[in-house]
């Protein structure tokens, strides 16, 4: 094989490190604020306020509902007024990660890539209702032709492409001048974890030297909330929002939908070293599988989750004895938490009892496509600072969930390496493994 700058030695094992990250979440609009709140066990769940949730079975969420802050982010990045909230917070988190890594000069290159997990944004009931109202004919009748015509007029004015899933990746590539590969991944709750995994692989195989990877999601809207309610996976603890998300607790009754964004700058370790940029942690392994079971349910035997964790360990050339912390998918649904616990015990065997396991979703809800990125960033911070954030609202133990879930209070601990689990509708499973930097 003839070596070129686009095809390095195929036998080489390039190390991949994190040099910057940033987050926008309901408990902190940048990484430091989020981390301080997470370690303190702050909940971002409250009654939905940016639309009237009356009549919905679930009326609570961990939403990004500070309109003034969203507009501040929009102005900072000179984004169009028609760009959806998910794009705005995604660009904000990406800009923060790039600034933290000092990576802007090296992103404007064909040796850089952008990898995004998001589902885009759709028209909600208010949009459709307004379109129907505006398209009325004499006597108040709404025809298909009239509705379609009004929809087309409004979509054109709004620039409909801005709601497409691939728009955020394209927007980021344009914003930073990235001319290498771009990818948008839609695998439900594993989207941004898989995006980061593919960025890691692209660096490992030499396709790029640096990548901007993560995800964003802002879908707390009437239709989305109702759809998740119809699946029977949402908590209905409307009277006590702050304690509704309670992963691994015996009283758990479903997840709380959240909103947010998380981005990380990944780069080849030698590339970061040449730039003189210190690494925060190393991304050392990645595993991905599919249950091939049911679109709406995970396999009860946890085979996909088990396979993803084992693949990540094998990819990193580590064993169960080398892992100290697990950032669990931990949705607070009866089935997920039980299956994930059993899967961890299967993979780690006797080592499982000493693991620290916690769920970020207990504080910020389930941010769907953005969850994997936010939770990997949390895992990186845990490795950096040698502390495991808590699973809040854990009060009543479940006999089938019997690991150390870091209940309610952060735990300082030696964390040499950690994994972040993401499992999604459709049977998608992704596991990312990070470890501390060898000094």
Annotate each PLM feature.
Residues 1-80, 101, 118, 270-282, ...:
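ACP-dependent fatty acid/polyketide chain-elongation machinery
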Residues 137-155, 197, 201, 218-273, ...:
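Glycine-/small-residue-rich "gating" segment that lines the acyl/pantetheine channel
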Residues 18-20, 38, 94, 114, ...:
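Conserved small-residue
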Residues 207-253, 286-300, 330-337, 354-404:
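Acyl-CoA/ACP chain-elongation machinery
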Residues 90-103, 165-176, 182-217, 256-277, ...:
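Active-site-proximal alpha-helical scaffold in enzymes
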Residues 18, 42-186, 216-225, 320-336:
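Conserved beta-ketoacyl condensing-enzyme motif
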Residues 1-18, 106-109, 316-322, 353, ...:
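Flexible, low-complexity linker/loop segments at domain and module junctions
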Residues 15-19, 46-47, 239-316, 325, ...:
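Condensing-enzyme catalytic core mediating Claisen C-C bond formation in acyl metabolism
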């Amino acid at each position: 094989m003839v070596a070129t700058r686009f095809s390095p030695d195929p036998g080489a094992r390039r190390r991949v490190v994190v040099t910057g990250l940033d987050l926008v979440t309901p408990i902190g609009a940048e990484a430091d604020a989020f981390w301080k709140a997470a370690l303190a066990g702050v909940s971002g769940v409250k009654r939905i306020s940016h639309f009237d949730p009356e009549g919905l079975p679930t009326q609570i969420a961990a939403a990004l509902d500070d309109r003034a802050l969203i507009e501040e982010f929009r102005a900072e990045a000179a984004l169009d007024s028609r760009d959806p909230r998910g794009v705005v917070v995604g660009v904000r988190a990406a800009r923060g990660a790039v600034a933290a890594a000092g990576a802007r000069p090296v992103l404007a290159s064909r040796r850089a890539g952008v990898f995004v997990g998001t589902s885009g944004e759709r028209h909600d009931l208010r949009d459709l209702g307004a379109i129907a109202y505006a398209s009325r004919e004499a006597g108040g009748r709404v025809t298909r032709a009239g509705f379609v015509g009004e929809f087309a007029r409004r979509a054109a004015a709004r620039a409909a492409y801005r709601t497409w899933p691939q728009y955020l990746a394209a927007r980021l590539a344009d914003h930073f001048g990235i001319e290498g590969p771009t990818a948008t991944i839609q695998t439900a709750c594993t989207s941004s974890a898989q995006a980061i995994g593919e960025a890691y692989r692209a660096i490992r195989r030499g396709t790029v030297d640096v990548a901007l990877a993560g995800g964003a999601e802002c879908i707390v809207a009437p239709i989305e909330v109702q759809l998740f309610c119809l699946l029977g996976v949402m908590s209905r603890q409307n009277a006590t929002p702050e304690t509704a998300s309670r992963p691994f607790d015996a009283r758990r009754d479903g997840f709380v939908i959240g909103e947010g964004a998380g981005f990380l700058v990944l780069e080849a370790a030698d590339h970061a070293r040449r730039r003189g940029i210190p690494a925060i942690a190393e991304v050392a392994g990645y595993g991905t599988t599919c249950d091939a079971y049911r679109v709406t349910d995970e396999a009860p035997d946890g085979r996909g989750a088990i396979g993803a964790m084992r693949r990540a360990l094998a990819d990193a050339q580590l064993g169960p004895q080398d892992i100290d912390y697990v950032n669990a998918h931990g949705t607070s649904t009866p089935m997920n938490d039980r299956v994930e616990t059993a899967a961890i015990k299967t993979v780690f065997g006797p080592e499982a009892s000493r693991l620290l396991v916690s769920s970020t979703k207990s504080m910020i809800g389930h941010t769907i496509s953005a969850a994997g990125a936010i939770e990997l960033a949390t895992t990186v911070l845990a490795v950096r600072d040698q502390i495991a954030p808590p699973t809040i609202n854990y009060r009543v133990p479940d006999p089938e969930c019997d690991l150390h879930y870091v209940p309610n209070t952060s735990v300082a601990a030696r964390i040499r390496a950690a994994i972040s689990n993401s499992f999604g509708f459709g049977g998608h499973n992704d596991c990312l493994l990070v470890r501390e930097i060898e000094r």
